[in-house]
Amino acid sequence: MSPTTAGIAFLASLVAAVVLVHVPLGDYMYRVYTSEKDSRAERLIYRVIGADPRAEQSWGSYARSVLAFSAVSIVFLFGLQLVQGRLPLHLHDPATPMTPALAWNTAVSFVTNTNWQAYAGESTQGHLVQMAGLAVQNFVSAAVGMAVAIALVRGFARRHTGELGNFWVDLVRGNLRILLPLAIVGALLLVAGGAIQNFALHEQVVTTLSGAAQTIPGGPVAGQEAIKELGTNGGGFFNVNSAHPFENPTPWTNWLENFLILLIPFSLPRTFGRMVGSARQGVAIAAIMGAIALASVSLTMLLQLQHHGTVPTAVGAAMEGVEQRFGVADSAVFAGSTTLTSTGAVNSFHDSYTSLGGLMTMFNMQLGEIGPGGVGSGLYGMLILAIITVFVAGLMVGRTPEYLGKKITPREIKLAASYFLATPLIVLTGSAIAMAMPGQRAGMLNTGPHGLSEVLYAFTSTANNNGSAFAGISVNTEWYNTALGLAMVFGRLLPIILVLALAGSLASQGVTPSSVGTLPTHRPQFVGMTVGVTLILVALTFLPILALGPLAEGIH
C-alpha cells in the first residue's frame, strides 16, 4: 500500500468512527447537562466546596466562578512545582531547575488547557506533580471549556432570563460523568496497545544495539496520555510527546489518540442541537467544522507528500522529523487534528515540516481552532463565527440579523467582534515585541523567514491555548516564560468572559418567530457562507505576517 493510500485509509477510518459515535455521545452529554438529578459523589463534592447545585448564576457570577477557580488552580500548581523536591516520587537530579518563571509558565499553561511546555517532562517534573498537578488540570481545564460552551448554548435556548446554569455543577458533571469514564477506557486501551503505566523514575536500564547501557525514565504515562488527548490538552509526559514509543508505541495507538482528540469536539454540536431544540442546527455546525478539518488535513498531507525539494524528492516525501512507524501521511493527519483542536500534542516535529506544511499547522490555530476546536472552546468559537456570518448576511439584505430566533443587536455583534479580535491582537503584539527586542532575537536558532515563523508560531500557539511549538527558539527564559504565560492567560480568560457576556445578553431576549426573510442556518448555503467568512476574516488578519514568514520561505 502506498503512503498516500495508507494516509487516506487512516483519515477515512477516523471520519467513519467519529461519525458513528458523535450522535450517541452528543445525546449523552445533552442528558448530563440537562439532568435534574445529582449522584451521591456529586452531592458530596457540592457539600465540600459549599456549592448549592440548584442555584442558578447570572453571566457575571458564572464568569467570576471561572476566574476564581482558574486563579486558585494557578496558585496551587505554581506552589506544588516549587516544593516538589520535598515531596514523594520527585526526581533526585532534575535536568531543568524549576525556577519561579518556569513554574508560573507551566501552571498557567495547564490551567488554561494550553499545555505549552518549556521543559522536558520526564527530566523535570516528578511523578506526584505529573499526577496530582498536571493530570488533574488536564481534567478540570477541559471541563471548564465544556461548561462555558454549555452556558452559551443555554443563552440561545433560554428566554427572558438572566440565568445560565451553575458553573460548579457543570464543572463537576463534566468531569465525573464525561471525561473520567472516557479517560479510563482510553487509558486501558493505550496500556493494551503498549503504552507504559508504572512508577519507575530512572530505574529502567536497557542495552542498546551498540551494546551500551541507557537509562530510560518511566512513569504513569497511559493515564495521563488518555486525558491529554481526550481533553484536547496536549502536554506530554515525555519531551518528544506522542512521538515517544512509551506514549504512542504503535500505529493502532496513534489512531486511537487521534480519535480521542476529535471525539468530544465533534460530538458537542449534537449536544448543541438537542439543547436548542433543532438537531439540524447541530448538523450544520458539525458540517462547518468537518469541511474545514477535511480541507486542512488533506492539504497538509498533500504538501508533506508531494512538496518540492531535493531531499523530499529523493525519499518520496518530507521524512525529516517524522517517526518511521507512523509515516508522513499519518503524521500529517495527526498534525492537522492537534492544531485544528486546542490539543497541541505532536507525533512529529512541526518545525521540520515543509514551509507550506508548517504554514498549515499555524493557520489551523489562527482560524481560532474551530474545526472542530478544543473541548468546549471549539463550539463556542464556532457559534461566534456563525453570529458574525449572520450579521454579514443581514448587512447584504438590509435586515436585522437573527440566529436561532435571537436578534443580533449592536451589543451582541460588539461582543462577537471583540472575541474574534482578542486573540489576534495578543498574537501580533507579542510577536512584534519579541522581534523588536535584540535580546529575544538572540535566542532564535534560525534567522530569516523561518526564524520569524518560529516566534509567530509560539505566540499563535499560546494565545490560542494550543501548546505545540516549532521549537526553534529558546523559550525557557524569564522573558519568554512571562510573556507567553500572559498570552495564555489573556488568550483563555478574555474570550471566556466575552462568551459569557454574550450568553447573558442572548438569554435575556425572547424568541423572534421565523419569517420569509429569516436566513435559514441549517442549510448548505449557510455552511458554505460561514466557511467563507471565516477564511476571509483570518486571511485579512494574518496574511501580512504570514507573507513575511512561511509564505516567503515557501516561495524562496
Swiss-Prot record:
Alphabetically sorted, this entry's keywords are: Cell membrane, Ion transport, Membrane, Potassium, Potassium transport, Transmembrane, Transmembrane helix, Transport
Broad class of where this protein is predominantly found: membrane
Q: Which InterPro entries match?
A: KdpA
| One example GO MF annotation | potassium ion binding
**Pfam families, A to Z:** KdpA (PF03814)
Entry's localization field: Cell membrane
GO terms for cellular component: plasma membrane
Q: How is this protein situated with respect to the membrane?
A: Multi-pass membrane protein
Membrane-crossing segments per the record: 6-26, 65-85, 133-153, 176-196, 249-269, 283-303, 378-398, 415-435, 483-503, 526-546
Q: Has keyword Transport?
A: yes
- Relate the assembly described in the record: The system is composed of three essential subunits: KdpA, KdpB and KdpC.
| Xref: HAMAP family | KdpA (MF_00275)
Query: According to its UniProt entry, what is the function of this protein?
Result: Part of the high-affinity ATP-driven potassium transport (or Kdp) system, which catalyzes the hydrolysis of ATP coupled with the electrogenic transport of potassium into the cytoplasm. This subunit binds the extracellular potassium ions and delivers the ions to the membrane domain of KdpB through an intramembrane tunnel.
Instruction: Name the family the entry cites.
Output: Belongs to the KdpA family.
List the protein's name. Potassium-transporting ATPase potassium-binding subunit
- Species this chain originates from: Mycolicibacterium smegmatis (strain ATCC 700084 / mc(2)155) (Mycobacterium smegmatis)
